[in-house]
Amino acid sequence: MDLISTFLLHFLLLACSLPPGAVSLRTALRKSGKVGPPLDIKLGALNCTAFSIQWKTPKRSGSSIVGYTVFYSELGSDKSLREQSHNVPVGQDTLITEEVIGDLKPGTEYRVSIAAYSQTGKGRLSFPRHVTTLSQDSCLPPEAPHQPHVLVVSDSEVALSWRPGENEGSAPIQSYSVEFIRPDFDKSWTIIQERLQMDSMVIKGLDPDTNYQFAVRAMNAYGFSLRSQPSNTIRTLGPGEAGSGRYGPGYITDTGVSEDDDASEDELDLDVSFEEVKPLPATKVGNKKSKKTSVSNSEMDSRLAQPTSASLPETTVAVPPTPAQRKGKNSVAVMSRLFDMSCDETLCSADSFCVNDYAWGGSRCHCNLGKGGEACSEDIFIQYPQFFGHSYVTFEPLKNSYQAFQITLEFRAEAEDGLLLYCGESEHGRGDFMSLALIRRSLHFRFNCGTGMAIIISETKIKLGAWHSVTLYRDGLNGLLQLNNGTPVTGQSQGQYSKITFRTPLYLGGAPSAYWLVRATGTNRGFQGCVQSLAVNGKKIDMRPWPLGKALNGADVGECSSGICDEASCINGGTCAAIKADSYICLCPLGFRGRHCEDAFTLTIPQFRESLRSYAATPWPLEPQHYLSFTEFEITFRPDSGDGVLLYSYDTSSKDFLSIIMAAGHVEFRFDCGSGTGVLRSEDTLTLGQWHDLRVSRTAKNGILQVDKQKVVEGMAEGGFTQIKCNTDIFIGGVPNYDDVKKNSGILHPFSGSIQKIILNDRTIHVRHDFTSGVNVENAAHPCVGAPCAHGGSCRPRKEGYECDCPLGFEGLNCQKAITEAIEIPQFIGRSYLTYDNPNILKRVSGSRSNAFMRFKTTAKDGLLLWRGDSPMRPNSDFISLGLRDGALVFSYNLGSGVASIMVNGSFSDGRWHRVKAVRDGQSGKITVDDYGARTGKSPGMMRQLNINGALYVGGMKEIALRTNRQYMRGLVGCISHFTLSTDYHISLVEDAVDGKNINTCGAK
């Protein structure tokens, strides 16, 4: 033990032996009354403007702690800035304290200390610690959402949907806020709802006949985004327009059917409200406006028109039956739960709502549209809705139907009674309305124009569990019902009024106020079963929830096709998809077909079928910048239907797209450079089942369309933008997802028919090699599918017929005949060519000098004699060529700094032999033809060498327009002999060729 240690030990022993009145060592070793610093201090950055700090109470404090102060200062580059403080009160029995310090600078380092306070004053500061807030890049708010889409529902309501921006920022999006402006009246935006948890809503209580725009902001943990691009200006319907009027709270709060209720829902002056796209809110008991009345059967019957059917009007007001069990993984929940109390006292789970049950008493909780399960927590994809007796789906009110309408419905019932359709002037059947209901397995079509009801009853009853189709038609007072294409039943309403006012939603499968509709519709039961299709006035209604479909809201709805794919066995990479409520197809990848994709085959000429959801995809051959300003497609196709998409591509991050579609028998070419859509439409309709040639092109924002020999159609896209960038594949015959297509593309259905040729900017898209993906593409009925060309020949479709391109050594319609004699003088047919890659030949068609001589004869004014150039050709690529253009003989070359073209005019397409000699020495060139004398020329710039890596072609070449940059569109139609290079290097045209197509002996047939 050293000297110091010995001294301290003796000092401690002395201190312990002091009497009580003496000063203790503990007091002597510290300042009197000072509280120690907090313990176990922990610092952490919360975000870019705040940090958190946590500590424990100091040990052995002489007096009770009354509070703390956090001292913090920003550390600059050279010195610390002014110190700031934050006081923290002490909670009861708090051993650990945690606090957040905010309003700080992003990405900044702070020095932090803490001191405790007691009754005796400030304690000792803790040892300083450092913490740095997160950088600004780590705390970004979201990007603005995409421009919202608005659907006008009535004179006071619109449905709004939007997609989030491309970047959600540094944290997930938590909610949205919605704003509106009336451009004709307002100068600033008004927020109508904040912290919305979804991306589609219905706005109620708007002013009728008024212009509106809407915008959306997204919010995450770091703040709000910028305002989205405002929606297109929309105008709410006028009070007198068909389909006008409010639905929702304005109707559902009136629970009675009193005839003396003078309050008019149309006169409600509601404030703007913002609601989720979900079923109508709860019907409340005891509404002071309502008064239940009783109407006798005789009173009701006296108000009905006599139907043509002998059946008397029937009314079903029995106890609602137990709904059919929901089947499949998407529809698990049973009948909505019944409670003994009213909705005022019932608490429903999230994604559900309450409706009072007047038939049973009490109330029921119903799942919102798209939700299911015991707690309405399961997502249900609805395409073919299934109803359970208490279900319904709502669509916008019938429009343009006040005088006449036609509705077609395909359904399968599981119970004898139930309401299928209802739309009217009020939610409770008062005034004008139309309805379709099942009553004891008979269909009842009822409508009232305001002065008396018509009841039209089907003559035959439906079969439970079987599919049925029913068509309703009304024109003025007259109505018609047709079941399963049977004999129509007609009827007529009473009185003089012939128009129907439709203000409520169109209800399918039931209605929230079905209990009160019994007098009008004849039943208080909801439908039980499935609906496969619904069409109004000739337009098929997409029954999926909005915004994908037209269903605005609903209650307790399942999916009829749920589980249909559970037992499916799609092989070879096929996937199952429901195509009807009770049937499926396998989406087979390219090269497979059959019910389960069991058959492998080679795709030759694609056949597309709308019923099989066919499509194929191919990437753009070159990068997008090659197609920004010019795009041209040539397509040969045979349509089997008047509607469908032929070709489509688009840009995912802008409005750019181009589409070629069939629409009502016409061909339409649509494109958008980002500032407006151009639509070009063929003048005449196309004959179905026949082959047609189509050419469309776009230069900047100008478009051209020509079908067969119809008049050329020209048009222009709107706006000032002139380029189109497409970053997706080219989709042919259909698209994978019709919900993702651009709004103005016109794409609604897959194409039904065949496509045998697609050429993009002179480049052929080959089915076998270039198609990279697709589903359910089969072979068309065409001779080329049977591979008729023998000995390696390739089949070239020519509408209904074909041509064979035969390899060297074979000839005949199907290349079936071998050429046994040597070909001294080859004959070319316009799609022929000979190829040479011998270095001794190629070096004589490159470098600083070139000399070529040949004899030829032809009957065509255009055709290529000789070509050598880079492949692929680029701007200012080196090349050398000799050929006929519009009757003139042209010698051209480019040494890298510009093209030289030396031309000799003459009658060279006379079918006689002609001699031509083309000589180049550096930049200078000369061509001599027969006795016409020499023509000379010189290439521009400084380049003197011909630098080429490609092969030499004689008489033509593959993809001639593409490879020559459209200098030549076809090969020679004629013969060539005596081909000599460098004055003395004689080439045996056929024997020296490494490849060739369609070569025969000159003069042979």
Curated annotation (Swiss-Prot):
GO BP, one annotated term: extracellular matrix organization
Function: Involved in both the retinal photoreceptor ribbon synapse formation and physiological functions of visual perception. Plays a key role in the synaptic organization of photoreceptors by mediating transsynaptic interaction between alpha-dystroglycan and GPR179 on the postsynaptic membrane. Necessary for proper bipolar dendritic tip apposition to the photoreceptor ribbon synapse. Promotes matrix assembly and cell adhesiveness.
Subunit annotation: Interacts with DAG1 alpha-dystroglycan. Interacts with GPR158 and GPR179; transsynaptic interaction is required for synaptic organization of photoreceptor cells.
CDD domains: EGF_CA (cd00054), FN3 (cd00063), LamG (cd00110)
Xref: Pfam families: EGF, EGF_Pikachurin, fn3, Laminin_G_1, Laminin_G_2
PTM statement from Swiss-Prot or TrEMBL: O-glycosylated; contains chondroitin sulfate and heparan sulfate.
Subcellular location(s) of the protein: Secreted, Extracellular space, Extracellular matrix; Synaptic cleft; Presynaptic active zone
Record Gene3D superfamilies: 2.60.120.200, Immunoglobulins (2.60.40.10), Laminin (2.10.25.10)
Disulfide bond residue pairs: C343-C354, C348-C365, C367-C376, C530-C560, C565-C576, C570-C586, C588-C597, C784-C795, C789-C804, C806-C815, C975-C1002
Gene Ontology molecular functions: calcium ion binding; glycosaminoglycan binding
Name used for this protein in its record: Pikachurin
Signal peptide stretch: 1-24
Family annotation (InterPro entries): ConA-like_dom_sf, EGF-like_Ca-bd_dom, EGF-like_dom, EGF_Pikachurin, FN3_dom, FN3_sf, Ig-like_fold, Laminin_G
Domain EGF-like: 339-377, 561-598, 780-816
Keywords recorded for this protein, A-Z: Cell projection, Disulfide bond, EGF-like domain, Extracellular matrix, Glycoprotein, Heparan sulfate, Proteoglycan, Repeat, Secreted, Signal, Synapse
PANTHER family assigned: PIKACHURIN, PIKACHURIN-LIKE PROTEIN
Positions annotated with a glycan in the UniProt record: N47
Domain Fibronectin type-III: from-to ranges: 37-136, 144-239
Comp. bias intervals (Polar residues): 305-314
Region Disordered: start-end pairs: 281-328
GO CC terms: basement membrane; cell projection; cell surface; extracellular matrix; interstitial matrix; photoreceptor ribbon synapse; presynaptic active zone; synaptic cleft
Ranges where the Laminin G-like domain occurs: 382-560, 605-784, 823-1002
